[in-house]
Amino acid sequence: MTNTAERVWSLDIGFPDWLSIPRGARDIDWWRPAVTLAFETLSEADHQLRGPLSESGTVIGVDEAIDTLLDFAESLPADQRLVAALGLPDRWPLPVVVAVTAVEDEPQDLLAAAGARGGRPIELPLVDYLPDELGDGIRVTRFDLDDEGAVWATVCCARRADDVDTILTWRTNKLDLVPRFSPVLESLLGAVRIGSAA
């Protein structure tokens, strides 16, 4: 559970679909052994379904995957959290940054907050409205070049409700994942629970 101004928010998620990486996870004695066991179980399930190699031709390294998530989580500002999707065989973990912020008196344009404005994308960002059940929000998909000329996709789901912006951000250079994972990202937005602080 996280405080944002006078709001309290949490994520209604859990294994095997999602993993939440808590701040200071390296200092939690039980966390890494538990996640290692969970990842080894998922890896074995992938092996049984698809053989020893992933679609990309490599074996998912459990220790490396955990270290990458921990490093990513530690790099985030205090008002952001990291979760990882585990539901796509051979492609997990897919890290997603969750940010919940109070709307200011002169709020930023939601399109800008979701990454639809600014920068130099290689084409105009795609903007879609979220399903009605998720509230007033958008999904923005944009493609940019990195310094080496590789194409990266950024998918952002943003919702503004009750004076709070909820923004989920996922980046990947595996472009074939974008149409498969975008609906999953939307479902995560529906799992963000926001209430008032006592």
Regions found by a protein language model. Give the residues of each.
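N-terminal targeting sequences that direct proteins away from the cytosol to non-cytosolic compartments
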Residues: 1-151, 159-165, 169-198
